Amino acid sequence: MLAHQTSLARRTCLTQLGVGALLVSRSSSALAAAEPNSQAELLSRRLPTTGIEVTLPPLADNSNAIPLQFTLQAPAGQQLVGFEIIAPENPNRVILRFKLGQAQARLSFSTRIRLAMTQEVWVLAHLSNGSSLGRPTHTVVTATACFDET
């Protein structure tokens, strides 16, 4: 009798694990579909670029710590409610996503980012009316090397 109960409990547990794995895989694919997938998709949105000033070096020799600074200015009558930094060629495209606790008309931000390769980094600003602003900035990532002729 005990062997039958253990077998039943094991089957129930394995069934529940399978259902859980299925739900997790579906939710992660839905999340991936909700994020911008490519440079082409970001360009197709034709976001206005006014009010976004981005400073990113045109050439970076250390892809692990590239300085990025930007200033966001909301259009008249609007407020900034959040922003994102997106690198479409990185394995994880969304580098940073902030939702502001208090809407602001102007925001300055500075950080260091990691890039997988040469690409355009996008700064997206989300406004209180549900619209967005976006600006791409191109940077070339090189690999530094030491050449020894010995």
Residue ranges and their predicted role:
Residues H138-T144:
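Short beta-strand edge segments in extracellular beta-sheet folds
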